[in-house]
């Protein structure tokens, strides 16, 4: 009996839009939810990209380190194949944002604990911050879900800023696809300035993951979705690898044409 021919390996994405890099020497915030006992330096991340045929990467600001952005900025200076998001004080000046943009920073990540109140979204300080980000050509990256996301996205609708929602919109919170966050996310996508990351699927119920991805592909389309590995899988290192993160992508977005369109959209968005 003739053995079935081996299928070709899936084409890897061109860009990983969500990963963290750090060393143990970096200062942790007082409220850090975990304290990694290992380093994941930029050199290790780049080696991971190379090993899997991925050309570009986006370093995502991690809550563990607050607004300590020094390591990411140093990585950007050395590696032009990278972009980064940072965390910033809302009082950051337009000049500082322009300098960060020139350095390869493409956006600012916003996240707060799930039970914490949002800032005054209609107040001067917040609106000034968002306006300055938009003027600098940066986006706002939202690591929010549920009611928090449901309240945040409508407040940004008239501010002219692009938004990227992390990790499927944290669908594990408040009702999943029937909750306020998912509904607001779909409405924001329809307005044309919001994208969603197909990332950190290992943090969601495995039995629901494919359905979440299918629904987002149906309503948003691949041009509004980015893939991110969430390497080095903080808190889940024992059960996740970079290869498994890619295999998850291939499983939940099975059409290579959809994956290619996702890559093309991310390359355009992150200005590669």
Give residue spans per PLM region:
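Mid-to-C-terminal alpha-helical segments outside catalytic/metal-binding sites
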Residues: 1-13, 38-56, 215, 221-226, ...
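Alpha-helical scaffold segments that flank or form the walls of functional sites
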Residues: 32-60, 65-78
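Active-site environment of divalent metal-dependent phosphoester hydrolases
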Residues: 22-25, 64-67, 91-92, 115-116, ...
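Catalytic pocket-lining loop regions of alpha/beta-barrel enzymes
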Residues: 122-227
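Short, acidic/polar
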Residues: 39-48, 91-100, 180-181, 212
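Active-site gating/metal-coordination segments in enzymes
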Residues: 66-147, 195, 200-203
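Conserved, mostly hydrophobic/aromatic
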Residues: 18, 49, 72, 100, ...
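Hydrophobic faces of well-ordered beta-strands that scaffold small-molecule active sites
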Residues: 15-19, 57-60, 83-86, 108-110, ...
